[in-house]
From Swiss-Prot:
This is L-arabinose isomerase 2. It comes from Clostridium acetobutylicum (strain ATCC 824 / DSM 792 / JCM 1419 / IAM 19013 / LMG 5710 / NBRC 13948 / NRRL B-527 / VKM B-1787 / 2291 / W). Belongs to the arabinose isomerase family. CDD domains: L-arabinose_isomerase. Pfam families: AraA_central, AraA_N, Arabinose_Iso_C.
Amino acid sequence: MLENKKMEFWFVVGSQHLYGEEALKEVRKNSETIVDELNKSANLPYKIIFKDLATSADKIKEIMKEVNYRDEVAGVITWMHTFSPAKMWIAGTKILQKPLLHFATQYNENIPWKTIDMDYMNLHQSAHGDREYGFINARLKKHNKVVVGYWKDKEVQKQVSDWMKVAAGYIASESIKVARFGDNMRNVAVTEGDKVEAQIQFGWTVDYFGIGDLVAEMDKVSQDEINKTYEEFKDLYILDPGENDPAFYEKQVKEQIKIEIGLRRFLEKGNYNAFTTNFEDLYGMKQLPGLAVQRLNAEGYGFAGEGDWKTAALDRLLKVMTNNTATGFMEDYTYELSRGNEKALGAHMLEVDPTFASDKPKVIVKPLGIGDKEDPARLIFNGSTGKGVAVSMLDLGTHYRLIINGLTAVKPDEDMPNLPVAKMVWKPEPNFIEGVKSWIYAGGGHHTVVSLELTVEQVYDWSRMVGLEAVIIDKDTKLRDIIEKTTK
């Protein structure tokens, strides 16, 4: 299982010496209380550390330098308790290389209408400080996040939590390594891309390996290891031979287990956390990896088919953000076009991510019409329901583009007893017709990463962190705006 690294966020509070030591003591006390209460709330995925008061340019620069070199620090949350002259923030903010959230809150929820005086105003002037600080971030084009509201409010805490998850993904992105077994599927356009630019902009390392390298690792797997894993399957899944001879069924499933163990070892040796395969490049293998891929997806590995390394890396990135919950590789396959009931059916030839499963997955063995190999084993299940996003990354030659489409996953209208793959059904925003049109005009690929844990805003926040063009297709989308933005 790939575990997310332990991370923390530093809380830095803006003020100045103008107000005197007694005021600064109160600022520090209030700051410590906020951090302590936020950590106790259990509403945040990572711990917040109160670092210090920011009362001089040298102090701020010193803090930001430390943020940059401390691997465990994923980002900075700033709060302006009082007015904090923003020229002090320029040097430190310029060198900050990690995500920044400006928390526009204040210690007290209410104005003490009957007793408020200038002492109170001088101490509790976040409204004043927020605007000065916000100006310098805008001037520096920092692409920071702004969260506004009372710090005890659960919805406000959720916004901070959502940003923390994205910031953790941003940090993890620098460590994403994709192993490509074989090249891209021949003649397919959208899966191509500039690997050097992806490493510069997103931190992704993409390495090629011949399929023989994987086969060599598979050959080292012992029968005892395979048998032990097969026994574990009896508790995890429904083993369904169907019309297959039981001995043949077991043999095919165990071949996928052999692939799984060999593949995992190969990835672990090279510290890879994402990978691709290609059904056109299977020399030396008996089956296209199916169940093997799905099992590794469940452990947090990113994946995409047909050599699509961009989507595999994106899959790993979003899995970090969601702690590998209801997030995975997907492909738009076919439409339901009945008026008023339009929707898309998503699947893939084998490798649908089991983090989507709404029921206990079933292991089946069926023929596969492509790849010219033996019948592969795979997990089948119905996908979960709920609101989420479909995300596609494409290389336009001049730059990368990220397309983010809000969606609602729904139950299928009927059972699909003859479809031998896992599947998910969804309705894109703002509606089926305009959603699909917008996707096509924007150049969106047929491969996506779907997540039922992330929001459009979270994925958009990541795009801003890395300076990536984003096309948002959601409930507020106007088709003409999409056309104007994407076809000039």
